[in-house]
A protein has these predicted regions:
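Alpha-helical transmembrane segments of integral membrane proteins
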Residues: 1-168
Length: 168
């Protein structure tokens, strides 16, 4: 966990900018760097969930009656740790989309022949385009907004569906 703590102590955008500058801006380098730096949150979440579930009374009672560690892990710990991880994956996807768009907007992501919402928004920086040519920046901005909100709503729905404490 100390390695994850070290990675999490630096702002992710700074690390991503440095690594993309070293590797070179392309869709593959951005995807790999965002994926490689995203593991720390999942490692922290999995570690905390496994510790929390392993301290529950039903796990301790299974240990008390002599259930094997393999059976405890597969029957109790993994199924009860799966829901928070699935929810975190959906939120991480939305964050990765925003990060890629931000990097493309800054010129460190997908290069201009390639299509990216960040590149499309970068093309609409002048006041003339912003005020008189709405069709240049409005569709990519709205598409980005709808995509990220949809993924976040999907994560909320999964959380509500998998959380046994919520009463309908």
């Amino acid at each position: 966990m100390r390695v994850a703590d070290i990675f999490m102590s630096f702002p992710s955008i700074v690390l991503i900018l440095v690594l993309v500058a070293v590797i070179g801006p392309s869709i593959w380098s951005v995807t790999i760097v965002i994926g490689v730096l995203g593991w720390t949150q999942f490692a922290r979440l999995i570690y905390a969930n496994v510790l929390s579930v392993s301290e529950k009374e039903y796990v301790e009672s299974a240990r008390a009656i002599g259930t094997s560690n393999y059976k405890i892990i597969t029957r109790y710990i993994l199924p009860n740790s799966f829901a928070p991880i699935l929810i975190a994956i959906t939120f991480q996807m939305a964050s990765a989309i925003l990060m890629e768009s931000s990097l493309s907007f800054l010129g460190m992501g997908v290069q201009p022949p390639g299509a990216s919402w960040g590149n499309m928004l970068y093309d609409a920086q002048s006041i003339t385009v912003l005020s008189k040519r709405l069709w240049i920046w409005m569709p990519p901005g709205i598409a980005l907004l709808i995509t990220v909100l949809s993924i976040n709503f999907l994560g909320d729905g999964i959380r509500d569906a998998l959380d046994p404490k919520i009463k309908i």
